[in-house]
C-alpha cells in the first residue's frame, strides 16, 4: 500500500476520501489492521547488520510504503555529529539513538541496528558533511502500526475523530469501504529487477509458496528442463549469504525466459547505457545498449546475469559470479566489464 513505485494507488488518500464520502465524522471504536496470527520471521541466515535497513524490509501480510521509513538528517563539518531532524512516517514504539558523524566521504555509510522487537534502534556510521538534508532509510518491522498512525492523523486533519474505544470484535455489520486493485504482476517484476526491491522479491517468493519456496522453485526448474542440483535457497531476494545457485542454472533460465516469457521480462532487466545499476558494466561503446542484465552484490560478492548482443548481432545469455574477492569492488566490476567487451567484440 502506498508504494513509491506505484504512486497512483494513494491508499491512505483513498481511505480518507471513502470515509468522508460515507458521511462519517466520528469513529466510535478503533481502526484495526487484520494481519493474521503468524508474524513474519526474519530468515536466520540474514546478516544482523542488514535487518533494520531498508533493503532488509520483510514481506508482511500488510505492507505500507514499501515497509520503509526515512530518517532525515543534517550534517555539519567533517567529524561533527549529524542531527536527526525527523522520522517519516512515524515509527510508533521505537526510539532512535543517533551516533552518526559527518564525513568528507561523499557516500551514505550510515547503518541502522536492531531487531523487530527492539524498542531502541542504533544509528551509526557517517554521512557526507555539510548537508542540510540527508536521507537514511530503515525497514519497518511493524508496517501496520505506521499505517495506523498515519491514517488516524490524516482523518483527524480531515475532521474525522477516532475515539479509540474498545469494542466487541466480530463480523456483524461490516460494510465494504473500498476495494484496491493490485498492480499487474509484470509491473511488480519490472521494479523488482530494475530497482532491486528485496521486499517485492520476498513477496513474489511468498506468492510461489508461503512455506516451501525453495522446494517449489527446484521442482519448477526440473519441470522446464533445468538442472536444480547445487541450489540452496534461504530466501527469495538474495540477501542471505547462505544462498547458492550455479552460474549455469541462471544462464539456462535466461535461455528459457527469452523463449517463454517474452518482452515483459526482458524489459524488466537494467539496460546498459540507460540504467544506473549497470553503468560500470556497460561503460564501453561496444556494450552500451547491448547489455541487459541483473546485478547482485554484497560484501565480497559481485554478480551479473543477463543478455549480451555481440558485433555479429547474436544475443548471448551469460552469468558471471565473483565470490569472496579481495580489493576494490569497482576494479572487480571493471574486470567483469572487460570480459564482456572481449566477448562482444568477437
What is the predicted role of each segment?
Residues 160, 165, 195-198, 202-346:
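Small-residue-rich helix-loop
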